[in-house]
């Protein structure tokens, strides 16, 4: 196509939402009219599936659960009065609690207001709040936010080291739907110990966000924590940003959560429309399907041209990959579906991997995120060249990259926001939640469970149980053992490599095992109890 034909294609396929001022452009995806027509029956079913989901159908058949994140920003759509009331109550409780913290009505244990916020969580309990904090937190928030989102001891030390003199002014939120997920539990144990060592009552600083009746809820109530907020059974971690999981940290930072919810609700209305060309999420799902031939053959590279949106690609990694990366479809057929997602930000990436995108392996499509407003209103932009600002350069480099990629046969989508504010970010979250759901219907997979994650947890538990047995055996041993001898003694010669990893880690951390010999020759290493 020449430039005028491309312009006409752009105009023909451009989506614009006048209330949100958001554009979606799929014109640089090379699809044809026959491909679109072939997908219409699939979309008719996808729209019907989505309507049933919102009405309360069991949309997660593997776990027998409803899927209700859309109700969070439109409680009136909830299938029962009880769910509707629970949603409304949770939002009001979040707002009331945040206001009390800001005013000092709930003070820190040593007196004065809380100034720091430490969020302990994993997966969606961290990625959503991190993205929203980076995008929307004011320059001088009422509480400065920090995260523990792993079970890395050095990571704990670094975060707690930064907060060492401020633990007395730090509010700690622990988020875990089940209440027993190892990573947040481990973080909670270590943070609680830090408070005990500092002589500060942890319960006067602690808040839980968890499922009703969970171990975490029981602990919080028994120990008299400040508050417990719910995670509803019908909300998954990766779609929990508009639940207390995301709303509470946002509200405590002074972010307008009502605007966030309103933006999501408005986008939900737009993406509820059962009309392919007039539904922005359907347009995204169609583009993903065609560019990857319905099999995820192309990676999604996310390039937001805005520093505030730096973490959007990490947020989308979980939303897209955990939802769509499935081995079997709804009929039990082995399909190995998924779309790989990665990215950072423009223009940084133009000086990193865009070289490969332009000239190397064509195994991707790009999603550009454009923001029209350069900076906050009232802040002038100086000229860096005659009649050119830094923001003009940002815009020019986005356009230039989009053009250079297309000219070399590389496809792209562009999503344009008017500005980065709570309303736009809420809409962006809702847009991609719906696109993922529609795409999942197109390829007939369950987007709302994560059996692969559970498999990893089970394997980790088996490793830790083997470690306990190993330590007992080594401590009882007189003299030394080789790895094969240890494996034979434990009755698991087939797990010798796992044993090697365990003893190497224990030795490196002074944990009761002494390993001697040449590290390059694992079979010849000598294993014995660490001297007292």
From Swiss-Prot:
The keyword Isomerase applies. InterPro entries: G6P_Isomerase, Phosphoglucose_isomerase_CS, SIS_dom_sf, SIS_PGI_1, SIS_PGI_2. It catalyses: alpha-D-glucose 6-phosphate = beta-D-fructose 6-phosphate. The keyword Cytoplasm applies. Its main location: cytoplasm. The active site is at 322 (proton donor), 351, 457. It comes from the Bacteria. GO terms for cellular component: cytosol. Pathway: Carbohydrate biosynthesis; gluconeogenesis; Carbohydrate degradation; glycolysis; D-glyceraldehyde 3-phosphate and glycerone phosphate from D-glucose: step 2/4. It is an enzyme of class 5 (isomerase). It is found in: Cytoplasm. GO terms for molecular function: carbohydrate derivative binding; glucose-6-phosphate isomerase activity; monosaccharide binding. One of its GO terms (biological process) is gluconeogenesis. Its EC number is 5.3.1.9. Pfam families: PGI. Keywords: Cytoplasm, Gluconeogenesis, Glycolysis, Isomerase. Catalyzes the reversible isomerization of glucose-6-phosphate to fructose-6-phosphate. HAMAP family: G6P_isomerase. PANTHER family: GLUCOSE-6-PHOSPHATE ISOMERASE. NCBIfam families: PRK14096.1. Belongs to the GPI family. This is Glucose-6-phosphate isomerase. It comes from Synechococcus sp. (strain JA-2-3B'a(2-13)).
């Amino acid at each position: 196509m020449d430039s005028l034909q491309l312009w006409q294609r752009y105009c023909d396929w451009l989506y614009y939402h006048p209330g949100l001022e958001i554009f979606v452009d799929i014109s640089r995806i090379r699809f044809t009219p026959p491909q679109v027509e072939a997908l219409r029956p699939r979309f008719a079913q996808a729209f019907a599936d989505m309507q049933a989901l919102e009405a309360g159908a069991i949309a997660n058949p593997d776990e027998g659960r409803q899927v209700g994140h859309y109700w969070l920003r439109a409680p009136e759509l909830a299938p029962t009065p009880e769910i509707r009331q629970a949603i409304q109550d949770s939002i009001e409780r979040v707002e009331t609690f945040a206001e009390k913290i800001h005013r000092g009505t709930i003070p820190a244990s040593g007196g004065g207001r809380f100034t720091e916020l430490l969020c302990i969580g994993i997966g969606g309990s961290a990625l959503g709040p991190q993205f929203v904090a980076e995008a929307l937190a004011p320059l001088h928030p009422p509480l400065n936010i920090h995260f523990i989102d792993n079970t890395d001891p050095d990571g704990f030390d670094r975060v707690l080291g930064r907060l060492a003199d401020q633990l007395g002014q730090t509010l700690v939120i622990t988020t875990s739907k089940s209440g027993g997920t190892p990573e947040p539990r481990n973080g909670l144990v270590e943070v609680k110990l830090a408070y005990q060592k500092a002589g500060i009552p942890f319960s006067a600083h602690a808040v839980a966000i968890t499922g009703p009746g969970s171990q975490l809820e029981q602990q919080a109530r028994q120990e008299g924590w400040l508050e417990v907020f719910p995670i509803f059974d019908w909300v998954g971690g990766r779609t929990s940003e508009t639940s207390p999981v995301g709303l509470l940290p946002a509200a405590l930072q002074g972010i307008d959560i009502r605007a966030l919810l309103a933006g999501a609700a408005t986008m939900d209305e737009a993406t509820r429309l059962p009309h392919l060309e007039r539904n922005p999420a359907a347009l995204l799902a169609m583009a993903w399907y065609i560019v990857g031939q319905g099999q995820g053959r192309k990676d999604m590279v996310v390039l937001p041209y805005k520093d505030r949106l730096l973490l959007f690609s990490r947020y989308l990694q979980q939303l897209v990959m955990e939802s769509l990366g499935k081995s079997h479809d709804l009929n039990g057929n082995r399909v190995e579906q998924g779309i790989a997602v990665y990215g950072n930000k423009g223009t940084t990436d133009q000086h990193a991997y865009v070289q490969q995108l332009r000239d190397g392996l064509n195994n991707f499509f790009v999603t550009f995120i454009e923001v029209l407003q350069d900076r906050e209103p009232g802040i002038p932009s100086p000229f860096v060249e005659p009649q050119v600002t830094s923001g003009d350069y940002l815009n020019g480099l986005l356009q230039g990259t989009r053009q250079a990629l297309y000219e070399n046969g590389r496809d792209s989508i562009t999503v344009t926001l008017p500005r980065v504010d709570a309303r736009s970010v809420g809409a962006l979250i809702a847009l991609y939640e719906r696109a993922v759901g529609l795409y999942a219907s197109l390829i007939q997979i369950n987007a709302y469970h994560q059996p692969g994650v559970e498999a990893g947890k089970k394997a980790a538990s088996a490793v830790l149980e083997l470690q306990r047995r190993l330590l007992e055996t080594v401590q009882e041993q007189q003299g030394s053992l080789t790895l094969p001898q240890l494996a034979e003694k434990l009755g698991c010669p087939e797990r010798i490599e796992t044993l090697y990893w365990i003893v190497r880690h224990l030795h490196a951390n002074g944990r009761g095992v002494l390993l001697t010999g040449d590290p390059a020759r694992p079979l010849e290493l000598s294993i014995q109890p660490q001297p007292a």
